[in-house]
């Protein structure tokens, strides 16, 4: 489905190749090189090339010239050749007042983002002063045959990331071959839709001086038409260009298991806790290779669901691959070998000539700021919140029966869901692994600014479990703390009102709460009677969530649902998946109280609710 290679920019080779074309390149890292996939039609290609030149000039950089990349199209299959783009390289001069490395690459990043929005039919494989990507829709053995450049003796690089793609979630294409601009990824990001929605919403709260006044021009951060790997690459690239070191960006997006891992230092757990309040994990099986040209790293997902083995040789080589034996090696030359463990990272700093293990990398980042002090000052835990009257009035049986009819409870659901779940409390599959790796904690309140490290970012409410008891919800409603404003919005409407009209009215109430400073929104269907019915809870949650995403308020408001409707596992899974941070199933809990009173559960109410939740 595709193969590619990411290397450092081979200055000696390009200086020679460009000189033959009449292009005089400046010194190493004094220019950037872009690898372009242009439309096949000559007119479209020329228009796109001219557009790029104009954008480069407008951004205050100098355009040096174009080079058509020599390729052997005859090695391609018929399908790959039919959709093969025109492959060109463009060279851009670094301005005198711009530092080499990241500062120059940031200027090139702005150029690329503006160009992508102006010429959507073109694709930029890479545009950097430090790295370049050669890739295409062919097999591994055809890579060096197809690209003549890769066979040149002058093509030199201290690193190479090679990837062969097998499509899982998207169709094969030239653009979707790996490596992307920073990463090569074996696996899939299962949480991608939620991650992308959160990044979209986060754009409203992110601020950085790195781009000056150019931040709006590089948005949206993520191209939602890309593959899951490409979207992860988009996010990492944006974080890096905003000033976050690439290994730190990888650590934040793919954290190791930390919440229940007592072997980690307190400082390290505080670091992860701080970032967990702002960034959800990009989760799924993943072996990740990444490089910005100065560092080369590898990371494994926290479940360790993809293989990654490495060895270090006595001549200074680090070889890491999904299998051993990808290169023929004399065993006597191997100084060290091993495999990446779940959630761990290996990093080579090419500028310093250092090979850093996971602890060296993570502990350095954990020590950058007083994360523990910030959390002690600002993170509020629901279990620590007290209310004067902690007794919640029980729901009368007659009222419970009426509400069960209103919300469509059946005898089978009552018996097979509510009773069975409260009675059995099934243990998770692989309980030991899940206890270490997974976390049910959710964070409620306004999201902090991911790009600015400060104490206020972690001023949120931490809830250990997303299924709330009536007492938990009472605590949240009664919460009167600086930085928190809780507003309850009814999702009831009068009978006969079209659902569309009811939703529009709900959006008005949500926007009103936002303008009044709310950062915790409780959607409630309490009060159902003869004249008022509830908007279906999943519809209400998903509609409000999408409304907040579209209006870029999603990170400013957390949604909690107070509803009598959810009672099955699937109900809770979909509600949480479609936008609710937490759910209070007050009617299901009332049913458990009745079952306990009737002696159908041989445990007390609180134990039964815990098993049910």
Per-region residue spans from a language model:
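Catalytic cores of alpha/beta
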Residues: 565-579
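Acidic, glycine-rich active-site loops and adjacent beta-strand->loop/helix elements
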Residues: 165, 324-326, 527, 563-567, ...
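Short beta-alpha connecting loops at secondary-structure transitions
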Residues: 213-222, 327-333, 556-561, 590-612
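Active-site or pore-adjacent capping/gating segments
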Residues: 342-344, 348-350, 576-613
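Conserved short alpha-helical segments that host acidic/polar catalytic motifs at enzyme active sites
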Residues: 1-448, 454, 469, 477
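Non-catalytic terminal/interface segments that mediate subunit docking, oligomerization
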Residues: 151-155, 178, 412, 423-552
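Secondary-structure transition/capping motifs at alpha-helix termini
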Residues: 153-155, 241-246, 511-521, 545-558, ...
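Conserved short loop/turn motifs at secondary-structure junctions
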Residues: 255-256, 524-533, 558-566
């Amino acid at each position: 489905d595709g193969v590619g290679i990411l290397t450092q920019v081979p200055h000696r080779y390009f200086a020679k190749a460009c000189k033959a074309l009449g292009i005089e390149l400046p010194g190493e890292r004094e220019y950037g090189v872009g690898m372009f996939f242009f439309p096949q039609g000559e007119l479209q290609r020329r228009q796109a090339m001219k557009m790029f030149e104009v954008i480069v000039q407008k951004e205050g950089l100098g355009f040096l010239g174009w080079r058509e990349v020599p390729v052997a199209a005859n090695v391609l299959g018929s399908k790959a050749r039919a959709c093969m783009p025109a492959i060109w390289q463009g060279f851009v001069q670094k301005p005198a007042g711009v530092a080499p490395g990241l500062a120059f690459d940031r200027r090139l990043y702005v150029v690329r983002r503006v160009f992508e929005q102006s010429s959507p039919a073109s694709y930029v494989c890479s545009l950097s002063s430090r790295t370049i990507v050669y890739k295409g829709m062919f097999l591994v053995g055809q890579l060096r045959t197809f690209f003549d450049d890769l066979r040149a003796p002058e093509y030199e690089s201290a690193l190479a990331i090679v990837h062969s793609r097998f499509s899982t979630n998207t169709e094969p294409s030239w653009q979707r071959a790996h490596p992307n601009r920073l990463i090569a990824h074996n696996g899939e990001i299962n949480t991608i839709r939620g991650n992308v929605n959160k990044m979209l919403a986060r754009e409203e709260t992110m601020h950085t001086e790195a781009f000056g006044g150019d931040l709006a021009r590089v948005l949206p951060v993520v191209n939602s038409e890309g593959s899951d790997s490409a979207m992860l690459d988009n996010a990492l690239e944006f974080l890096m260009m905003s000033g976050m070191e690439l290994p730190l960006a990888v650590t934040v997006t793919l954290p190791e298991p930390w919440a229940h891992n007592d072997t980690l230092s307190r400082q390290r757990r505080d670091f992860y806790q701080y970032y967990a309040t702002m960034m959800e994990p990009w989760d799924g099986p993943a072996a990740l290779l990444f490089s910005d040209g100065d560092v080369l790293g590898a990371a494994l997902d926290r479940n360790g669901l993809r293989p990654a083995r490495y060895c270090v040789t006595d001549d200074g080589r680090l070889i890491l691959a999904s299998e051993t034996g990808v290169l023929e090696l004399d065993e006597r030359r191997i100084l060290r070998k091993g495999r990446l463990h779940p959630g761990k990272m290996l990093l080579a700093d090419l500028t310093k000539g250092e090979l850093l293990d996971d602890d060296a990398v993570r502990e350095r980042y954990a020590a950058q700021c007083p994360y523990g002090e910030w959390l002690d000052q600002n993170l509020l835990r629901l279990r620590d919140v007290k209310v004067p009257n902690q007794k919640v009035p029980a729901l009368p049986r007659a009222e419970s029966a009426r509400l069960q009819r209103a919300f469509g409870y059946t005898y089978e659901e009552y018996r097979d869901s509510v009773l069975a779940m409260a009675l059995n409390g099934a243990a998770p599959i692989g309980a030991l692994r899940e206890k270490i790796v997974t976390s049910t904690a959710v964070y409620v309140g306004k999201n902090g600014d991911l790009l600015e490290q400060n104490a206020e970012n972690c001023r949120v409410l931490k809830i250990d479990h997303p299924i709330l008891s009536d007492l938990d919800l009472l605590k949240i409603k009664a919460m009167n703390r600086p930085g928190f404003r809780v507003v309850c919005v009814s999702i009831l409407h009068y009978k006969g009102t079209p659902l569309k009209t009811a939703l529009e009215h709900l959006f008005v109430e949500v926007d009103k709460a936002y303008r009044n400073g709310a950062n915790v929104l409780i959607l409630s269907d309490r009060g159902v009677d003869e004249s008022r019915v509830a908007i279906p809870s999943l519809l209400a949650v998903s509609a409000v969530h999408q409304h907040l995403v579209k209006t870029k308020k999603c990170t400013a408001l957390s949604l909690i649902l107070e509803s009598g409707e959810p009672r099955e596992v699937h109900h809770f899974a979909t509600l949480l998946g479609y936008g609710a941070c937490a759910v209070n199933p007050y009617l299901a809990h009332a049913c458990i109280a009745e079952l306990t009173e009737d002696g159908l559960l041989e445990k007390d109410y609180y134990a039964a609710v815990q098993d049910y939740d």
